[in-house]
A protein has these predicted regions:
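Acidic (Asp/Glu)-rich catalytic clusters
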Residues: 119
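Conserved small/polar residues in nucleotide/adenosyl-binding loops
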Residues: 1-8, 192-197
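Active-site-facing alpha/beta catalytic cores
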Residues: 3-114, 131-132, 136-147, 151, ...
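Residue-level detector of short coil/turn "hinge" positions at structural boundaries
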Residues: 44, 122-123
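Short acidic catalytic loops
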Residues: 123-131, 195
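Acidic, Ser/Thr-rich peripheral helices and adjacent loops at domain boundaries
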Residues: 179-188
């Protein structure tokens, strides 16, 4: 079971169930998310921020991979670092509200090069096929995954770095406004039985 890691204090209630957590685009700059991630014994994906600045995401990964001593819930805590902290590319939004994808070959190559120069452990990326990468057009998710698979066939570096995809799906196809209240329909998702890439 995976979870988007919004509130660190909730982790202790779910820790026996979770095998993966993602730190969202709006939380990736938060120092407490980085420190707590360094003490987890499961993979933690760090999304790029909505600005698209990869250096922020990479700094978050570096912090999560390092060991730390910090205060958490009134206790002094020591973490040994999480070598499984990695990138999640989710696209970005410009100051004018335009979506910009970052799953293309050139984007993956740029991330690989940054990993190589930064001395990271276990360079890895999950590609988020929704959010700004799809422009919130959920039916684009399969095409995006196929494009990344194509990039992986043309570069061993990219093939070794890409570990999977984040695909949003739910019981009913399509999306709805929060106030619509249709059971089984998400506010962002693809039908869970839709064909895979």
């Amino acid at each position: 079971l995976g979870d988007v890691y919004k509130r660190q204090e909730n982790h202790r209630y779910l820790s026996d169930l979770l095998s993966y957590v993602a730190v969202g685009a709006r939380s990736v700059e938060n120092q407490e998310h980085r420190l707590v991630s360094s003490g987890l014994d499961i993979p933690v994906g760090m999304k790029n921020p909505t600005s698209g600045d990869l250096s922020i995401m990479l700094n978050s990964i570096k912090a999560a991979q390092g060991d730390h001593t910090f205060l958490y819930r009134g206790w002094e805590v020591e973490s040994k670092g999480n070598e499984l902290a990695h990138a999640i590319l989710r696209g970005s939004v410009s100051k004018h509200g335009n979506n910009h994808a970052n799953y293309h070959y050139e984007d993956l190559r740029k991330l690989h090069d940054a990993y190589c120069t930064g001395n990271y452990k276990n360079p890895a990326v999950i590609v988020d096929t929704n959010h700004s990468n799809s422009g919130k057009k959920y039916l684009e998710q399969v095409r995006i995954a196929n494009e990344v698979l194509h990039s992986m066939r043309h570069s061993d570096d990219i093939k070794n770095m890409v570990k999977g995809f984040m695909v949003e799906s739910y019981i009913e196809d399509g999306s709805q406004k929060v106030e619509d209240g249709v059971y089984g329909k998400s506010i962002t998702c693809l039908l869970y039985t839709s064909p895979s890439p």
